[in-house]
Regions:
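Conserved glycine-rich FAD pyrophosphate-binding loop
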Residues: 4, 35, 40, 48, ...
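Short beta-strand
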Residues: 24-25, 204-210, 275-279
């Protein structure tokens, strides 16, 4: 259902700006655990009722929808046309929204093989600090477009403005898709994934947890079945990947504190150092660590406190910025949100 709530949203923003009131932006509410906690005295503004698909051209592989549109609805519409969101956005039981996925920059299991959210955002419509609605980007992919605002807002956690609508590039749905499981050691899993990565294979997801390597093969029927016959393994449901991406499986269930390390696939680590590794070992997960894992870590990569629970470890959710990086962030924030209206401190406590 197409619902236009833009006027009400712009009026609320303009009034909050005039009254110097901070705003906490919400959609489906499925990602409020990410980032630093919202300010307790901030006024809530919801984009959930600003929803629906505005424009869809299957033949052009482009869809435009309002920020409150459920990801589940988008997937359903695309599936009827044999198309997908290639960055595998986590579904969170049908409550996750398009705006939340783009604002948090949250990609799923296909990320290292298909691309990130920002790679598929063509354009956005945003509500700025004074209540004005502005559009950035467009509805076509340009090789020489440069680094535009539509990419800048991906992963900005709503700190630059409120996403009202988004244009996305979509891709054809693979003809077939299977998930295979192999009971192997960490060393064997690394070796097998390295071999698959070097080959022209239909690999579209990978995960190592508790002595088990899981991979997803996506593509043409002949290619996928040929790879399966060579690799072997036990076949399971491909629903596994959304359960993984939403942390709806062990060992994530019941966890209070979850940390993510984003690093290089080749970065070495010990057998029992991480509970889960996916994205071809480029994304690694720690569960309920006794202390801040950033302290004393000498390897490459960035740590994120992905799920804080009781926030027993008092620190920034995201990797601390250098003084130069923080200064750049502040300059960008000052241009888009000079009065500090949108989601203050959600990304960093100094923003």
């Amino acid at each position: 259902m197409l619902v236009d709530n833009l006027e009400a949203l712009t009026e609320q923003v303009a009034a909050a700006n005039k009254g110097s009131r901070s705003l906490t932006i919400v959609g489906g509410g499925t990602k409020m655990f990410l980032g630093n906690p919202p300010l307790e005295n901030a006024e809530e503004i919801s984009v959930r009722r600003h929803c629906g698909i505005v424009d869809y051209h299957p033949e052009e592989l482009v869809i435009r929808a309002r920020a409150g549109t459920p990801i589940a609805e988008l997937k359903q519409v695309l599936d009827k046309e044999g198309q997908i969101l290639a960055f595998d956005p986590p579904d969170h039981g049908g409550s996750a929204t398009l705006g939340g996925v783009v604002a948090t920059g949250l990609s799923g299991s296909r990320r290292p093989y298909g691309g990130a959210v920002k790679d598929f955002v063509l354009g956005v419509g945003m509500i700025l600090h004074d209540g004005a609605y502005c559009e950035f980007g467009g509805q076509v992919m340009k090789n020489v477009a440069g680094y535009d605002v539509s990419r800048l807002v991906c992963g900005s956690f709503g700190t630059l403005g409120i996403l009202a609508d988004v244009s996305l590039k979509v891709l054809p749905k693979p003809e077939t898709e299977i998930t295979l499981v192999f009971e192997v050691s960490l060393a064997e899993a690394k070796k097998q994934l390295e071999a698959l990565t070097r080959q022209v294979s239909p690999l579209s997801a990978s995960c190592f947890v508790d002595g088990s390597l899981k991979i997803r093969l996506s593509g043409g029927q002949v290619s996928v079945q040929s790879s399966k016959s060579v690799l072997g393994g036990e076949e399971i449901s491909s629903d596994y990947w959304n359960l993984l991406d939403t942390h709806s499986i062990e060992p994530f269930l019941g966890s209070d504190e979850v940390w993510r390390l984003s690093t290089f696939s080749e970065e070495p680590f010990d057998d029992d150092e991480f509970a889960v590794c996916d994205w071809a070992f480029a994304q690694r997960w720690l569960i309920n660590p006794a202390s801040n894992p950033r302290e004393g870590y000498q390897g490459a990569g960035h740590w994120t406190r992905f799920k804080g629970g009781n926030h027993s470890i008092d620190c920034e959710a995201f990797e601390p910025l250098s003084s130069v990086e923080l200064a750049l962030h502040k300059r960008i924030k000052k241009v888009f949100d000079p009065n500090g209206l949108f989601n203050p401190q959600r990304l960093y406590r100094d923003l």
